[in-house]
A protein has these predicted regions:
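A broadly conserved detector of short glycine/acidic/proline-rich loop/turn motifs that flank catalytic sites
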Residues: 15, 23, 42, 116, ...
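Catalytic phosphate/nucleotide-handling subdomain of diverse soluble enzymes
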Residues: 23-54
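Short, electropositive, low-hydrophobicity segments enriched in small/polar residues
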Residues: 17-22, 45-46, 79
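Glycine-centered flexibility sites
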Residues: 13-15, 41-42, 75, 106
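Structured core elements
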Residues: 10, 36-38, 67, 93
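Active-site-adjacent helical/loop segments in soluble small-molecule enzymes
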Residues: 1-33
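A conserved regulatory-domain signal marking ACT and ACT-like small-molecule sensing domains
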Residues: 46-140
Length: 140
């Protein structure tokens, strides 16, 4: 992920061994001159790459998945989304869950996936939801 984030290069695991060795100090660069590390291979499944990126964002606190309930009436979803906007959340995906054992009559569930700026922003979003009367359960 380091190479992808910093250099925008897609390099398969074996092709990044030189960078890994330098980062772990397993190899010491020459005292004079320039050290060159060869990067090779971009043979990676794009679906796997997307999964890795999502996992990395979640791990770094830049992706938040929550489940909450809202009244099953017109305007409830709009009110929830307005609240999220006030918290600066960037909505990536939403699922409207109408049928679940845990839901009471007159309620509907909403699963939200949001992009955040980091752990502090995640906490602010959760606080904004709580202040708005929403009980949000963070999902893995």
């Amino acid at each position: 992920m380091l190479l992808l984030e910093r250099t925008k290069l897609v390099v398969e695991g074996a092709g990044a061994v030189g960078v890994a060795a330098l980062r772990r100090a397993a190899t010491v660069p020459a005292e004079s001159g320039t050290t060159v590390v060869i990067l090779s291979g971009g043979n990676i499944d794009t679906g796997v790459l997307a999964d890795i990126a999502r996992h990395h964002e979640t791990e770094r606190g830049r992706r938040l998945r929550v489940f909450t309930t809202i009244p099953d009436e017109p305007g409830s979803l709009a009110a929830l989304l307005t609240r999220l906007g006030e918290g600066g959340a960037n909505l990536i995906d939403i699922a409207h869950v109408r049928e679940a054992v845990a839901l009471s009559v007159g309620q509907t569930g909403v699963e939200l996936v949001m992009e955040t700026r980091g752990p502090d922003h995640t906490e602010r979003i959760l606080a904004t939801l709580s202040e708005g009367g929403y009980s949000a359960k963070v999902l893995d």
